[in-house]
Amino acid sequence: IRILTPAVEAMKAQGMDVYGPCPPDTVFMQCNEDMYDIVVAMYHDQGHIPLKLLGFYDGVNITAGLPFLRTSADHGTAFNIAWTGKANPESMAISIDMAMKITRE
């Protein structure tokens, strides 16, 4: 709270439409109900659990704080179905599309 609240206030001062910090046990459902456009999670597991529940096949993981853009499909490698013809590439395609959209903005 001592770091997040001043960061949110600084973004508001720059004209950004932001809200928070929010309790993680409710914010993802609120986002799913279109109260927010995006949720920034402070921890990997805190963000992945609801993202996988709400959008396993179309969720995109965006890693912040790197010197390069990193997006990935929001599921594992599924070695158990590798080379069986069962894998669905759609979430990887969505991840690539998101990376291209971000680089254009």
From Swiss-Prot:
Catalysed conversion reaction: 4-(phosphooxy)-L-threonine + NAD(+) = 3-amino-2-oxopropyl phosphate + CO2 + NADH
One Gene Ontology term of the molecular function aspect: NAD binding
Enzyme class, broadest EC rank: oxidoreductase
Pathway per the UniProt entry: Cofactor biosynthesis; pyridoxine 5'-phosphate biosynthesis; pyridoxine 5'-phosphate from D-erythrose 4-phosphate: step 4/5
Cofactor note: Binds 1 divalent metal cation per subunit. Can use ions such as Zn(2+), Mg(2+) or Co(2+).
Subcellular location: Cytoplasm
InterPro entries: PdxA_fam (IPR005255)
GO cellular component, one term: cytoplasm
Cofactor: Zn(2+); Mg(2+); Co(2+)
Keywords: Cobalt, Cytoplasm, Magnesium, Metal-binding, NAD, NADP, Oxidoreductase, Pyridoxine biosynthesis, Zinc
Pfam families, alphabetized: PdxA (PF04166)
Residues bound to a divalent metal cation: H44
Binding site for substrate: K52, N61, R70
Enzyme Commission code(s) on record: 1.1.1.262
One Gene Ontology biological process: pyridoxine biosynthetic process
Keyword match Magnesium: yes
Quaternary structure annotation from Swiss-Prot or TrEMBL: Homodimer.
Function: Catalyzes the NAD(P)-dependent oxidation of 4-(phosphooxy)-L-threonine (HTP) into 2-amino-3-oxo-4-(phosphooxy)butyric acid which spontaneously decarboxylates to form 3-amino-2-oxopropyl phosphate (AHAP).
Note: The active site is located at the dimer interface.
The family this protein is said to belong to: Belongs to the PdxA family.
Full protein name: 4-hydroxythreonine-4-phosphate dehydrogenase
Organism: Enterobacter agglomerans (Erwinia herbicola)
